UniProtKB/Swiss-Prot annotation:
Its cofactor is Mg(2+). GO terms for biological process: mRNA processing; regulation of gene expression; rRNA processing; tRNA processing. The active site is at D66, E133. Residues 20-144 form the RNase III domain. It catalyses: Endonucleolytic cleavage to 5'-phosphomonoester. PROSITE patterns: DS_RBD (PS50137), RNASE_3_1 (PS00517), RNASE_3_2 (PS50142). It comes from the Bacteria. Mg(2+) binds at E62, N130, E133. InterPro entries: dsRBD_dom, RNase_III, RNase_III_dom, RNase_III_sf. The gene is rnc. This is Ribonuclease 3.
Length: 261
């Protein structure tokens, strides 16, 4: 019996050691607080209770990592493109931080081999990208901003993202938004708020996008097409970051469906 206990303890520490070195290889530096990375790799489908009985998973770290990653990318772009305007910087950042890109990078980093997740949801979309963001949040808490920036540059940007190529790619946010609304049976509308002239007497359009009559994003541009694109881009950002807003929009879908019945 005592031998069995020793074998169990030995297997536990062997697994911990293996996980530590796998983490070390991924990070490129030794982790200080190993437990924070374990939490970052713990999907809510495998939540664990802490000593206070509260469920622990990586959702809070994902929230933090998303903000830190966006801030780091903003700094990189601000320095790389000193003469470009806010619209260009925002558009370029959105291409870098989009979920499909983060999903692929997470797999390339090997996060799929370390994540603790229920087999039932492992293939759900964007789980790996979300976990990568939680991982970035863990690095920030463990090592601070500068080390996190170093990780993003050396382990994400340099090997996997060609910023100059991304800049040349055009993202049609209005088309993507329209497809998303069709898929989820959501009413998409664009309303002109006002037209005005700038200092050079050029006409500027201000347009808002509405999802099921909820204001989702406001855009400006020198044509209706440009301002609708900008409003669609702001709407995508809101869809991605504002869960309360999404619930309100989808509540409208359910209400409409029940009325139809």
């Amino acid at each position: 019996m005592f031998r069995n206990i020793l074998n169990t303890i030995g297997a536990f520490f062997s697994k911990k050691k293996e996980s530590y070195f796998a983490l070390y290889r991924m990070l490129g530096f030794p982790p200080k607080n190993f437990s924070i990375y374990e939490k970052a790799l713990l999907h809510k489908s495998s939540s664990k209770r802490d000593e206070n009985g509260c469920y622990q998973n990586n959702e809070r770290l994902e929230f933090l990592g998303d903000a830190i990653f966006n801030a780091i990318i903003a700094v990189i772009l601000y320095k790389k493109f000193p003469t470009n305007d806010e619209g260009f910087l925002t558009n370029t950042r959105s291409k870098i931080v989009k979920r499909d890109t983060l999903d692929k990078i997470a797999y390339q980093l090997g996060i799929n081999h370390l994540i603790m997740i229920s087999a039932k949801v492992k293939n759900h979309k964007h789980i790996m990208g979300n976990t990568l963001e939680a991982f970035i949040g863990a690095i920030y808490l463990d090592k601070g901003y500068l080390k996190t920036k170093e990780f993003v540059e050396k382990r994400i940007i340099n090997p996997y993202i060609d910023i100059d190529t991304l800049v040349r790619e055009e993202v049609n946010f209005k088309s993507k938004l329209f497809e998303w609304c069709q898929k989820h049976k959501i009413l998409l509308q664009f309303q002109t708020l006002e037209n005005f002239t700038d200092n050079n007497r050029n006409v500027v359009f201000q347009i808002q996008a509405l999802l099921n009559n909820h204001i989702a994003g406001i855009g400006i541009g020198y044509s209706k097409r440009e301002s609708q694109q900008h409003a669609s881009q702001m709407t995508w950002r809101k869809i991605r970051t504002d869960k309360i807003f999404l619930r309100e929009v989808f509540a409208g879908v359910k209400k409409t469906n029940s009325e139809d019945k």
